[in-house]
């Protein structure tokens, strides 16, 4: 009987059951009979199919059940198959990494790549330049370390570093070095750390030892590059970690100088939490056709996010914040459950006895994929002074609070963020600069205490909540001066603007921009509590004063809103619905509150028909000055008629002269003070443009350009040289400032870096001064001692009082970088030259020079002569004893033999002693001298 043909390969949606059907067939070409004999006893009884005696519907049902069971077993997860190692799809195994690196990744504890790792590692493996936007805690360090180790593989015997990682701070560089060592355990790659504060001589020895990977801060690496005249032509892999902080800390000149010395064939990676304009320009100049990698969750607002905007006065912001925390979020006061649990463990004595073991177990038990607490809230403030003030105020209210801002110490910031992520605190008060690098996977609420000046910043703030299919809330406090920015945001999001209860209960917080006020009673109680705290606590009152001064600088430097939104905001703020009760407070008591608010609004808006002079004269019953009363009535009548004519002219201008985009319905909405949805306006504009004729356009634009007064006619005649038929403006006619400042959320691809970077670019204002993010400080300052202006660059790079020299790129660098210490080090080590890039390395050169073996540094026992004793100093006796002790040890500096040496010259005493010893030896031996 001929052998049965092998079954075809399974398709994507099907599976093969022929092995179960023909498991007793020994003529199969795929398996040997011996193997089948071994597998035959393992066959399950239900898989025995009887085709002779069967039939009917029961067999069909059995077949369907069998196929379903087989399919379920094929789709079973690999974790359920005990005793088998199944390769998981979509993990690190599918990225083509070597076995040693996969073992190191598993040992590190990584099982599934994070979103930023899943997007960047395949692109980096294809040798493309990458600009990745990722926050701290999202796994970006492993995202560039894993491809680097995969590319470098092992230590190279040729001289020259091949990988360079630049970090903004010493702490981040140490953290990166730790990750490199852990992931590179299966290789012999050498990694060195070059940061400020360490000995230059030791770093000379490290660089002489031919490292493969250099992890450094820009200032110290540039110092070594200039001092040692390093050749960077061998570097293949360059990483700028947290590039926005690199530029913020003033390393732009150092980065430009370092970038100039790198080869053009390098692969450059740039990771940043945000993209300032200066960083985009740097990426365009230093990277070759880069790919922008950006997570969707960081560029779009989640559809599950619900937004609420509250109109408040400047003096009621603190009370409004307290009302939101107490009554809307219902934030609990006192220590959290995590803080109480930690306190109990510390009290029980476990922490003192098993401190290290407990710390490891707690870190493993914490699941950062889950929400720290169900009330976890981030509050965004404008400056660091606001952060300090709100932190003190919230602590006084009894909330568990953490804080962070840009100039906060790195260790303190890490502790504060760790407390928030682990649930020890419920509230985190931050600035935009400090929060751009903090990654909180799941967040419940976001509060904008100070409304952002750009729509991008709003998206960046609220993008931290409503992730992974969960719902989230954002609450924003909007003052009257913030209304233009709110309208810019409404245009940018393309959502309907709802003021108060003008649409009744038909509002959607996830799709509308809903604005309203707080209940008056609840807000007044919160404001009274805040005022009482300010009166009782002097420190908090002083912090509020400092915060108000910082707010003036912040308002002076924030971006201006669009002109159209500024005009619209006047009408919106003046409407009664601006301060109406917010639809979020929709219950029986809120209905009574709404009626009460209307009554108070009518009372507050009452304007009598008579002036105070007329009322007084009418009450007295003696019109003493009839002439004055007549004059007042005549003036009032004239003013009323002027107001009436102005309103009629305005209504005619809106109805006839101004061309609308979305037809008569939108024009009516504009008269009523409501603003239509941007999508509807876009559809109406498209319909109008498709039906409009040349004559209609000519009439429309000519009526729009007609001057309305003599001044306008004069200006029009001055610019009459512009022929509207041929004139081309340098700006498009449909320019929207809100969209130009922001980016399109629902459009755009990352294929073009110029377009993608323009969409993602965002500048943040500084949180402690008037200087904006990425803006250079004043280049000169007044030197009181020398009575002249000097460069501030000397203060920033540590070379104050010294001159500057030009580097290879033409940029000015500190002259102290060329101090000659490397030449003195080589002379002390008796080295004429070090191996150049491309030559074979000298075995053990770096280890012999600095006793650096196996990553351990051995302490030397060098002795030096003390300073000579000065009789005029107070420590003369002490130094004299030190000199006498040094002379006794016979150091060569004071004459005589060195310690442990032997003098070649013999004196009379030495000769006499030698003769006596020789005579004693003769007597001891008692042997006569030999005579020949």
Curated annotation (Swiss-Prot):
Q: Basic and acidic residues: which segments have biased composition?
A: 639-653, 861-891, 903-913
Q: What is its main location?
A: nucleus
Catalysed transformations (reactions): ATP + H2O = ADP + phosphate + H(+)
Record motif DEAD box, residues: 241-244
**Biological process per Gene Ontology, one example term:** rRNA processing
Could you say which EC number(s) this protein's record lists? 3.6.4.13
| Motif Q motif: chain residues | 90-118
Compartment(s) of residence: Nucleus, Nucleolus
Q: Which residues participate in ATP binding?
A: 134-141
Residue ranges with Basic residues bias:
915-932
Pfam families under this entry?
DBP10CT, DEAD, Helicase_C
Q: Return the Acidic residues bias intervals.
A: 665-682
What PROSITE patterns is this protein classified in? DEAD_ATP_HELICASE, HELICASE_ATP_BIND_1, HELICASE_CTER, Q_MOTIF
Ordered alphabetically, the record's keywords are: ATP-binding, Helicase, Hydrolase, Nucleotide-binding, Nucleus, Ribosome biogenesis, RNA-binding, rRNA processing
**Where is composition skewed (Polar residues) in this entry?**
700-709
Q: Where is this region: Disordered?
A: 1-62, 336-367, 639-719, 784-807, 835-932
Q: Where is the Helicase ATP-binding domain?
A: 121-293
List the molecular function annotations (GO) for this entry: ATP binding; ATP hydrolysis activity; RNA binding; RNA helicase activity
Kindly give the InterPro entries that the UniProt entry links to this protein.
DBP10_C (IPR012541), DDX54/DBP10_DEAD-box_helicase (IPR033517), DEAD/DEAH_box_helicase_dom (IPR011545), DEAD_box_RNA_helicase (IPR050079), Helicase_ATP-bd (IPR014001), Helicase_C-like (IPR001650), P-loop_NTPase (IPR027417), RNA-helicase_DEAD-box_CS (IPR000629)
Summarizing the function annotation, the protein's role is: ATP-binding RNA helicase involved in the biogenesis of 60S ribosomal subunits and is required for the normal formation of 25S and 5.8S rRNAs.
Comment on protein domains: The Q motif is unique to and characteristic of the DEAD box family of RNA helicases and controls ATP binding and hydrolysis.
- So what family is this one in? Belongs to the DEAD box helicase family. DDX54/DBP10 subfamily.
Q: PANTHER family of this UniProt entry?
A: ATP-DEPENDENT RNA HELICASE RHLE-RELATED, RNA HELICASE
Q: What is this protein called?
A: ATP-dependent RNA helicase dbp10
Q: Which organism is it from?
A: Aspergillus niger (strain ATCC MYA-4892 / CBS 513.88 / FGSC A1513)
State the taxonomy lineage.
Answer: Eukaryota, Fungi, Dikarya, Ascomycota, Pezizomycotina
């Amino acid at each position: 009987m001929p052998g049965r043909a092998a079954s075809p390969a399974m398709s994507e949606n099907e599976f093969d059951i022929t092995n179960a059907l023909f498991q007793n067939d020994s003529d199969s070409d795929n398996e040997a009979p011996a193997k089948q004999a071994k597998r035959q006893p393992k066959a399950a009884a239900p898989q025995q199919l009887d085709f002779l005696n069967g039939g009917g519907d029961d067999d069909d049902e059995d077949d369907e059940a069998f196929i379903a069971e087989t399919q379920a077993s094929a789709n079973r997860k690999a974790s359920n198959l005990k005793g088998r190692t199944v390769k998981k799809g979509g993990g690190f195994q599918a990225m083509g990494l070597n076995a040693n690196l996969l073992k190191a990744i598993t040992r590190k504890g990584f099982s599934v790549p994070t979103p930023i790792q899943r997007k960047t590692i395949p692109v980096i493996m294809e040798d493309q330049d990458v600009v990745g936007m990722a926050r701290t805690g999202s796994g970006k360090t492993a995202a560039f370390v894993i491809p680097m180790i995969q590319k470098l593989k092992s230590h190279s015997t040729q001289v020259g570093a091949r990988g360079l990682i630049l970090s903004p701070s010493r702490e981040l560089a140490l953290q990166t070095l730790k990750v490199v060592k852990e992931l590179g355990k299966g290789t012999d790659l050498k990694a060195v750390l070059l940061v400020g504060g360490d000995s230059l001589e030791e770093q000379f020895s490290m660089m002489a030892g031919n490292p493969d990977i250099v992890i450094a801060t820009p200032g110290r690496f540039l110092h070594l590059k200039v001092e040692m005249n390093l050749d960077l032509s061998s570097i293949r892999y360059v990483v700028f970690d947290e590039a926005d902080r690199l530029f913020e800390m003033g390393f732009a000149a150092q980065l430009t100088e370092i970038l100039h010395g790198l080869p053009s064939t390098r692969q450059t990676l740039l990771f940043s939490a945000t993209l300032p304009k200066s960083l985009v320009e740097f990426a365009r100049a230093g990277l070759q056709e880069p790919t922008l990698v950006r997570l969707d969750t960081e560029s779009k607002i989640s559809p599950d996010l619900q937004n609420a905007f509250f109109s408040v006065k400047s003096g009621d912001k603190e009370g409004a914040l307290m009302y939101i925390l107490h009554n809307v979020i219902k934030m609990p006061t006192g220590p959290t459950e995590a803080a109480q649990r930690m306190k109990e463990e510390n009290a029980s004595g476990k922490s003192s006895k098993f401190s290290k073991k407990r710390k490891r177990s707690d870190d493993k038990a914490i699941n950062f994929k889950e929400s720290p607490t169900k009330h976890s809230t981030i509050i965004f403030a404008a400056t660091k002074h606001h952060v300090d003030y709100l932190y003190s105020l919230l602590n006084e209210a009894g909330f568990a609070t953490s804080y962070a801002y840009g100039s906060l110490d790195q260790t303190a910031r890490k502790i504060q963020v760790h407390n928030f992520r682990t649930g020890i605190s419920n509230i985190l008060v931050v600035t935009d600069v400090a929060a751009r690098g903090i990654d909180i996977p799941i967040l419940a609420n976001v509060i904008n205490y100070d409304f952002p000046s750009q729509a991008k910043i709003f998206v960046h703030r609220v993008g931290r909540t409503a992730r992974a299919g969960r719902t989230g809330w954002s609450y924003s406090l909007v003052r009257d001066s913030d209304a233009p920015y709110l309208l810019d945001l409404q245009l940018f999001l393309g959502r309907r603007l709802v003021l108060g209860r003008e649409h009744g209960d038909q509002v959607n917080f996830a799709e509308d921009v809903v604005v309203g006020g707080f209940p008056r009673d609840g807000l007044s109680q919160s404001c009274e509590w805040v005022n009482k705290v300010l009166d009782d606590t002097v420190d908090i009152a002083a912090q509020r004063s400092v915060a108000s001064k910082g707010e003036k600088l912040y308002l002076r430097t924030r971006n201006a809103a669009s002109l159209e939104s500024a005009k619209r905001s006047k009408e919106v703020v003046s409407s009664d619905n601006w301060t109406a009760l917010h639809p979020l407070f929709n219950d029986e008591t809120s209905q009574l509150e709404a009626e009460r608010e209307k009554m108070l609004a009518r009372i507050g808006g009452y304007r009598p028909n008579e002036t105070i002079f007329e009322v007084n004269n009418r009450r007295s019953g003696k019109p003493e000055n009839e002439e004055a009363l007549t004059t007042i009535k005549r003036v009032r009548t004239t003013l009323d008629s002027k107001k009436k004519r102005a309103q009629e002219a305005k209504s005619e201008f809106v109805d006839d002269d101004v061309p609308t985009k979305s037809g008569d319905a939108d024009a009516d909405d504009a008269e009523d003070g409501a603003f239509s949805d941007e999508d509807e306006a876009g559809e109406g504009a498209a319909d109008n443009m498709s039906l409009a004729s040349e004559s209609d356009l000519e009439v429309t634009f000519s009526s729009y350009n007609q001057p309305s007064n003599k001044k306008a006619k004069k200006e029009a005649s001055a610019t009459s040289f512009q022929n509207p038929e041929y004139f081309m403006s340098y700006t498009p006619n449909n320019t929207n400032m809100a969209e130009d400042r922001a980016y399109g959320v629902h459009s755009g691809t990352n294929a073009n870096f110029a377009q993608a970077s323009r969409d993602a670019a965002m500048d943040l204002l500084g949180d402690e001064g008037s200087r904006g993010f990425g803006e250079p400080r004043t280049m000169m300052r007044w030197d009181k001692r020398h009575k002249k202006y000097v460069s501030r660059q000397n203060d920033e790079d540590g070379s104050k009082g010294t001159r500057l020299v030009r580097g290879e790129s033409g940029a000015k660098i500190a002259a102290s970088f060329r101090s000659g210490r490397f030449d003195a080090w080589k002379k002390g080590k008796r080295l004429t030259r070090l191996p150049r890039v491309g030559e074979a390395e000298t075995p053990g050169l770096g280890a012999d020079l600095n006793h650096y073996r196996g990553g351990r540094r051995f302490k030397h026992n060098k002795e030096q002569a003390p300073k000579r004793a000065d009789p005029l100093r107070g420590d003369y006796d002490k130094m004299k004893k030190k000199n006498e002790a040094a002379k006794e040890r016979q150091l060569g500096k004071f004459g005589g033999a060195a310690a442990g040496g032997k003098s070649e010259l013999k004196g009379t005493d030495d000769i006499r002693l030698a003769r006596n010893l020789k005579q004693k030896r003769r007597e001891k031996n008692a042997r006569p001298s030999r005579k020949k």
